[in-house]
Each structure stands twice: as structure tokens, then as C-alpha cells.
């Protein structure tokens, strides 16, 4: 009885985690809770102590506060899930046929190129107005070079939140729009991972990379055994994480590495590929544990005063403009150029303009944008305001895309209803009934609507 109850509870948890709408709202709730806990007078001190509570691993250089453990450690679960899903998509999913996925793949690139341009442009305008110095809401001034280090903050799309908005407001949209967004966001994740590895990792001693390579090879063979030795797999995964950290590469990328090395084809008569199966099992931990707790600490930054001055801070405005305007601008421009100039084709039944509401949803940054804001700025105040910009910009993008998707969904619903009505009318017009009379005469009757003519 107890085992049945546990299975039922776990099945419920998995259903909640699988719902883009519910998991997205949970993460948003934790993000807002972090902002409140860090700024309410009676919780701010306790929250700060919790965030800075240090935990060290003996015989290593790893000694971090709880907030950094969440960012560098717990978030690895999310990146492992991303790695497994990427492997599945690259092998048998939407990215396995580059020709079919060409437009959304190119749109992902365009969506990552436009936001940094707008970010630097906005920062330049503020710098020109302030004689080269940029003053943030706290009153601290920074140079253009210092603030422009955050160019990568608005480049990433949060796939969970963007799909949650789609699930909430776009019930009648064709599946091709969701598939387009899924493909675009998957490539966006891959590009964000490369961006973190290249620009936000400081390479240390080479021998750590040798250790990472050994871990990768061992993982590759362990997960291909008929009976996977899970204890050994866990040890190898942890060692890969430690070596990534010691090598100066962001340790969450260990999750992506081992995820991509997991088989995505059925083996030994299995019904589903291991990459898909492992991703399904990890999804509840990623969606309901790793991401909400990360959001709690990522937005849990203390501001001396939450005033309107925050909304006109150069870095906040730059991040907001880059996410809300830059993302859809880059995606739509690339979609138009690739179809009208490059000769590529959209999915059947889709036009470029149909993608605009979904492109606006790609301006929802959150997870990876929060992470990049923490990595790009060494100054705590600047990093905090950048993350505030991500939070506000993402919420604005969510509202805009939600309104547009709702209107688009109603339009598609009306069009589908009209087509169905016309189709039914045509079928009625074509309905013919043959009646044989007693003398052998055949009378053809045609049914139109509810009237029968002979």
C-alpha cells in the first residue's frame, strides 16, 4: 500500500514537472520570493547569512557560499538535463535534419547577435550623456568598458519560461509554432553553453583537462553497459564537475559534457533511448528543485532602496531593451532574410509574421541570463542591477508575448472554425443518395445542408 502511494506521489510530481505552465509559474514565484526575502527588513539579514554560509570540499580549492553552491553545483542538474535533451534532439529529434531545422537554427543565431548590439548601443547613449561615466541606481559610477562587460547577459532564452507562456496563452496555435520555438530555444541553449565556456571561463593547469577527458571516456563506456553501474557513474560525474571547477571552466558544463556522451539510440532491446529516459527521470529535479532554488538566490540581491531609480539605471535599461526588443528583432530579421533572400522555407502553413509572438517570448531570459550576469560583473552592485534588469525585462517580454499569443491563438481558432464549416458544407453538397424504384428507375438524390432535392 505504501509503495503504491509513493508511486502515485512520484507520478503526480512528474506530471507537475512536465507541465511547462506550472513549472514556469513555480520558478517565477521563487524568483519574486528571492527579491522580497533579500529586501524585506525582517528577512534580509537572515537571507544574506544563508546565502553566504560556506561549505568546503576537503583537499580541494572548492570553498563557496551556499548561493554559489546553488549556482555552480545544483544548477548542474539543469545543465545535465539540457545535455541529455540536446543529444536526443541532435540524434533523432528536431536538429537531426539540419535542412528542416535550418530556419529556426539561424534564427537562434540572429536572436543572440542582436541583443548585444542593442545593449552596447544603449550603454553608449548613457555614456555620451554622462561624459563617459555611467551612474547606476546605487550611486556608484562605472566606465563604459566596465559596464559593457555585460554584453552577453541578454543573449539567452529561458526555454522553460518561453514554453510556459506558450502553454498559457496559445492553446489553439498549430504545433509547428511550438516546434519552431523548441528548436530555436534548443540551439539557443547550445550557443549559450559555448558562450559561457569561451568567454566566462579562466583556463588553469592543463592536467585538469586531461582528467576531464579521462572522466568523459569512462562515462561514455559506463552508460553503454547492459547494466549501468550507477554508483560508478555518479562518482565519475562528480569527479568531472570537480575537475571542471579546478580547470577554471564553469563546472555546470560538466553536466552538458556527460549528457552529450549518453547514448540516444535504443540498446539491448530497450523501448526508449537512455538519453531520453534519463532526461525524463531528471526533469522533476531540474524543474522543481534546481531551477526554483537557483531563481531564489539569483534574484535574492539586496538593494539599498527599491525605487524608480532602478528602472532608469543604465544597465537595467540596456538589459531590458536588449531582451524585449533585441531578441524578437534578431529572430524576425533572420527569419525574413533566410526565407526571402536565402531561399529557405518555413514549416508548412507558417509565414514569417506568424513567428512574431513566439519571437517575443524568446526575450524571456531568466536562468542562463542570471548566471551570465553573475559571471560577467565582478562588482556585486552592478551584477545585482543586471539581474534586476533580466527579471523586469523577462516579465515585460512575457506580458507582451502573452497578449500577442492570445490574440494569435483566437485568430487561428476562428480560421480553423471557418475552414471546418466550409469543409462540412462542401461534403454536404457532395452527398448523393441513389434510390431504386419498383420499376427499376434509379433516382439520384443530392443532400445540401438539411434539404434533400430529387
Curated annotation (Swiss-Prot):
The gene is nhaA. One of its GO terms (cellular component) is plasma membrane. GO terms for molecular function: sodium:proton antiporter activity. This is Na(+)/H(+) antiporter NhaA. HAMAP family: NhaA (MF_01844). Gene3D superfamilies: Na+/H+ antiporter like domain. NCBIfam families: NhaA. It holds the Pfam family Na_H_antiport_1. It comes from Bifidobacterium adolescentis (strain ATCC 15703 / DSM 20083 / NCTC 11814 / E194a). Keywords: Antiport, Cell membrane, Ion transport, Membrane, Sodium, Sodium transport, Transmembrane, Transmembrane helix, Transport. Belongs to the NhaA Na(+)/H(+) (TC 2.A.33) antiporter family. It is found in: Cell membrane. The chain crosses the membrane at residues 22-42, 64-84, 106-126, 150-170, 190-210, 228-248, 284-304, 306-326, 355-375, 386-406. One of its GO terms (biological process) is regulation of pH. Na(+)/H(+) antiporter that extrudes sodium in exchange for external protons. It catalyses: Na(+)(in) + 2 H(+)(out) = Na(+)(out) + 2 H(+)(in).
Amino acid at each position: 500500500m505504501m509503495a503504491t502511494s509513493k508511486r502515485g506521489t512520484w507520478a503526480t510530481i512528474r506530471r507537475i514537472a512536465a507541465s511547462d505552465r506550472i513549472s514556469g509559474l513555480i520558478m517565477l514565484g521563487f524568483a519574486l520570493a528571492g527579491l522580497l526575502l533579500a529586501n524585506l527588513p525582517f528577512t534580509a539579514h537572515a537571507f544574506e547569512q544563508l546565502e553566504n554560509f560556506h561549505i568546503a570540499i576537503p583537499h580541494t580549492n572548492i570553498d563557496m557560499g551556499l548561493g554559489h553552491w546553488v549556482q555552480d553545483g545544483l544548477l548542474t542538474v539543469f545543465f545535465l538535463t539540457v545535455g541529455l535533451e540536446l543529444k536526443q534532439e541532435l540524434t533523432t529529434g528536431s536538429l537531426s535534419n539540419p535542412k528542416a531545422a535550418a530556419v529556426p537554427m539561424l534564427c537562434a543565431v540572429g536572436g543572440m547577435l542582436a541583443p548585444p548590439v542593442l545593449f552596447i548601443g544603449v550603454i553608449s547613449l548613457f555614456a555620451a550623456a554622462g561624459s563617459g561615466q555611467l551612474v547606476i541606481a546605487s550611486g556608484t559610477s562605472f566606465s563604459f568598458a566596465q559596464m559593457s562587460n555585460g554584453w552577453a547577459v541578454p543573449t539567452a532564452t529561458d526555454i522553460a519560461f518561453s514554453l510556459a507562456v506558450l502553454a498559457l496563452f496559445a492553446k489553439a496555435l498549430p504545433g509547428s509554432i511550438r516546434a519552431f520555438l523548441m528548436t530555436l530555444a534548443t540551439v539557443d541553449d547550445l550557443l549559450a553553453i559555448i558562450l559561457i565556456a569561451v568567454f566566462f571561463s579562466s583556463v588553469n593547469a592543463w592536467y585538469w583537462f586531461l582528467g576531464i577527458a579521462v572522466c568523459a571516456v569512462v562515462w561514455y563506456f559506463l552508460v553503454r553497459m547492459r547494466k549501468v553501474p550507477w554508483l560508478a557513474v555518479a562518482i565519475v560525474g562528480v569527479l568531472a564537475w570537480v575537475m571542471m571547477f579546478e580547470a577554471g571552466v564553469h563546472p555546470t558544463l560538466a553536466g552538458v559534457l556527460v549528457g552529450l556522451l549518453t547514448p540516444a539510440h535504443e540498446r539491448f532491446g530497450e523501448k526508449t533511448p537512455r538519453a531520453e529516459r534519463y532526461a525524463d527521470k531528471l526533469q522533476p529535479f531540474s524543474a522543481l528543485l534546481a531551477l526554483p532554488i537557483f531563481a531564489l538566490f539569483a534574484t535574492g540581491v539586496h538593494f539599498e532602496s527599491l525605487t524608480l531609480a532602478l528602472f532608469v539605471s543604465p544597465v537595467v535599461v540596456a538589459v531590458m531593451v536588449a531582451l524585449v526588443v533585441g531578441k524578437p528583432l534578431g529572430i524576425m530579421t533572420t527569419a525574413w532574410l533566410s526565407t526571402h533572400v536565402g531561399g529557405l522555407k518555413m514549416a508548412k502553413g507558417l509565414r514569417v509574421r506568424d513567428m512574431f509572438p513566439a519571437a517575443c517570448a524568446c526575450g524571456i531570459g531568466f536562468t542562463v541570463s542570471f548566471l551570465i550576469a553573475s559571471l560577467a560583473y565582478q562588482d556585486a552592485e552592478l551584477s545585482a542591477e543586471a539581474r534586476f534588469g533580466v527579471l523586469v525585462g523577462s516579465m515585460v517580454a512575457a506580458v507582451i508575448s502573452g497578449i500577442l499569443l492570445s490574440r494569435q491563438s483566437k485568430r487561428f481558432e476562428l480560421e480553423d472554425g471557418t475552414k471546418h464549416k466550409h469543409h462540412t458544407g462542401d461534403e454536404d453538397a457532395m452527398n448523393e443518395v441513389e434510390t431504386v424504384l419498383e420499376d427499376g428507375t434509379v433516382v439520384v438524390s443530392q443532400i445540401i445542408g438539411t434539404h434533400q432535392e430529387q
